[in-house]
Regions:
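Beta-sheet repeat architectures centered on beta-propellers
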Residues: 2-13, 19-188
């Protein structure tokens, strides 16, 4: 694995982020996971801080996520997620995100996943801990609504968007879309 905590077991299958790719072991053999975002992840991975990489499972959606630091960051600031439940070898489902979580506790321990994030610029709101340097962690309840609620109770909508690479819509896949004459269909 890319780090001591870069592997995780889900339903008898081990998944891990290696130094050059993603893999799984199903009890019989090791399989390389086809990944369309692999270059995006590895070209900006801070290998000097790879001990920060850790894997997490979200059984609510059938996902394994690896949280990792990018080049120029000593702390986790990005994630890559593999959907093991809906992926098939010909169509693996991967997503990338700036979701930065330094710890993760899956549902099962509690009703929903809980996680923490670390910020070097935040100031703790609890009594001073002797010997601690700057920075603070935030404790998050995941998968609860569509708004972010801070410790002070302030609520804001979670910023979200979807970005995709090019793909073809073939004749049998265009339900709900009507093309008339020569045309080009772009979604942005």
């Amino acid at each position: 694995a890319a780090s001591q905590h870069g592997a995780i077991e889900v339903d008898g299958i081990a998944y891990w982020m290696g130094p050059t790719g993603f893999f799984k072991f199903d009890g019989g053999r090791v399989h390389s996971l086809p990944c369309l975002v692999e270059d995006y992840v590895y070209e900006d991975l801070n290998t000097n801080a790879n001990q920060q990489i850790h894997a997490a499972v979200n059984n609510l959606f059938g996902e394994v996520t690896w949280f990792y630091p990018t080049e120029g960051s000593d702390y986790v600031d990005r994630s890559v997620t593999y959907n093991y439940m809906e992926s098939v070898p010909q169509n693996p489902i991967w997503t990338v995100s700036s979701l930065a979580r330094t710890t993760w506790s899956p549902e099962g321990v509690y009703a929903k996943p809980y996680a923490t994030s670390y910020s070097t610029s935040e100031v703790p709101t609890v009594p001073t801990v002797q010997g601690a340097t700057g920075g603070a962690s935030t404790y998050w309840e995941q998968e609860k609504g569509t708004d972010e609620v801070t410790a002070t109770g302030a609520t804001s909508a979670i910023a979200a968007y979807v970005e995709s690479g090019d793909y073809d819509i073939t004749q049998d896949q265009r339900e709900g879309i009507t093309f008339k004459g020569d045309s080009e269909f772009m979604m942005r």
